A protein has these predicted regions:
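Structural preference for solvent-exposed beta-strand-turn elements
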Residues: 1-182
Length: 182
């Protein structure tokens, strides 16, 4: 459960990232294809279960309509993509898996509190002027992906941020340790 958020968070790194114990699963294939589409250099040794990601030469823009579909973790790309590109625009909500489509509202609320501007003019638009800013947020309910969105947005933001009612599962803690190591 930790690998997808960590792969999304790798977009926050200014240099190459090396990861191990990467399983060859469909969602990772989709995420790797998306990363390559936006200009990332990926070296994935499936036998050794290692991956080297370098996002230092990303395209200057991208079509967010090309976010990986059919995976719940697509929403975890919002904060890293905003950090990199300053704006994203979506035709529709990212679709989920058989477990159900995840709500976007908690993610949008968090991004807004951390300084993002949200618009709904026929498309969902999210933008930031510079960097995310520190904020305090009380989550209505514990959510792993909402907590991960908050942590990724706050990690490189200006000032201190606090999320009350955060999820604390081991894979959320793995993401936090990864971000601290960058």
């Amino acid at each position: 459960n930790a690998v997808l958020p960590i792969l999304c968070a790798s977009l926050l790194s200014s240099g190459p990232v090396e990861l191990s114990n990467i399983p060859a699963i469909t969602d990772i294939e989709k995420l790797v294809a998306f990363f390559r589409q936006i200009g990332s250099q990926i070296d994935w040794n499936r036998e050794a279960k290692t991956m080297r990601l370098d996002h230092s030469n990303l395209e200057s823009s991208f079509n967010a309509g090309d976010l990986p579909q059919g995976m719940r973790s697509s929403v975890l790309l919002f904060a890293p993509l905003l950090y990199r590109f300053k704006k994203i625009s979506l035709d529709s909500n990212p679709k989920g898996c058989a477990l159900g489509i995840r709500e976007l509202d908690p993610h949008l609320e968090i991004l807004s509190q951390l300084g993002a501007k949200i618009s709904h003019n026929g498309r969902l638009g999210i933008s930031i002027t510079d960097r995310f800013k520190g904020a305090e947020h009380w989550a209505d309910y514990m959510s792993v992906t909402t907590t991960e969105t908050f942590v990724m947005a706050a990690a490189l933001g200006m000032g201190n941020s606090t999320l009350t009612n955060a999820a604390s599962e081991p894979h959320v803690q793995d993401l936090c340790r990864f971000l601290e190591s960058m």
